[in-house]
């Protein structure tokens, strides 16, 4: 599952107790892997994943949504590369980390190639991941593929491996968008994952609804507020409420 830091009373500041509650809930729901979308997490969260046995796809804090142009701008190569390097240096001794992600939805360019090479120099024991371009990474990746496309990828790589060719594993870093009454076709997705060895699984978008605890006008109760509840215009409405569980962890 993909996880953002969110605490209803404290926003992006998540307590140790809330982190542990998240990990315990993941275990109870048979979730075995978490992607730190889209930034490295508090060191204590990695400690918890080590302790409870949760695989981690640790993601660097690199994203330039929108134009996605910075990844091919040479003046930004140091910023891209150093963020991945800092992540690896800080967290490389956590056994829960099984893969490094160079960033999220930032287009494709020379800066990610530089980051991938830098990560390999620091740690050549773990595979690298970036959905925007897998040519310089150890796995290929996709977001929100349909089951038929995923089936075609698995079938093609199975045939190639049977012919003696080397194929990369495929990771679906976001799928089954959990907004409203969603996570459709989950059974079909997992039948496909289990049918083909090259399909190593995927990360549901996302773990928990992001909202802020707000008191009612008379102060007698509270509600979970999101876009538009703060007098903000324009806003994204309920687009941040797309978690597997509610923001109060129920």
Predicted feature locations:
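An acidic-aromatic substrate-binding cleft motif
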Residues: 1-33, 37-41
């Amino acid at each position: 599952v993909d996880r953002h830091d969110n605490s209803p009373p404290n926003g992006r500041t998540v307590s140790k107790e809330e982190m542990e509650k998240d990990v315990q809930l993941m275990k109870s729901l048979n979730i075995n892997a978490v992607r730190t979308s889209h930034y490295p997490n508090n060191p204590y969260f990695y400690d918890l994943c080590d302790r409870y046995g949760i695989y981690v796809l640790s993601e660097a804090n690199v994203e330039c949504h929108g134009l996605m142009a910075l990844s091919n701008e040479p003046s930004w190569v140091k910023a891209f590369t150093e963020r991945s390097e800092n992540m690896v240096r800080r967290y490389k001794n956590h056994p829960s980390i099984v893969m490094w992600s160079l960033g999220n939805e930032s287009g494709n360019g020379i800066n990610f190639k530089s980051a991938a090479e830098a990560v390999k120099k620091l740690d050549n024991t773990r595979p690298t991941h970036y959905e925007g371009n897998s040519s310089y990474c150890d796995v290929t990746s996709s977001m929100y593929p349909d089951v038929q496309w995923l089936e075609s990828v698995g079938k093609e790589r199975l045939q190639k491996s049977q012919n003696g060719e080397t194929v990369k594993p495929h990771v679906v870093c976001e799928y089954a968008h959990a907004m409203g009454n969603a996570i459709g076709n989950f059974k079909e997705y997992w039948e496909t994952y289990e049918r083909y060895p090259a399909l190593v699984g995927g990360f549901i978008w996302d773990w928990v609804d992001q909202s802020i605890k707000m008191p009612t006008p008379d102060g007698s109760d509270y509600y979970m507020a999101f876009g538009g509840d703060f007098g903000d215009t324009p806003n994204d409405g309920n687009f941040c409420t797309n978690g597997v569980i509610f923001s109060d962890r129920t």
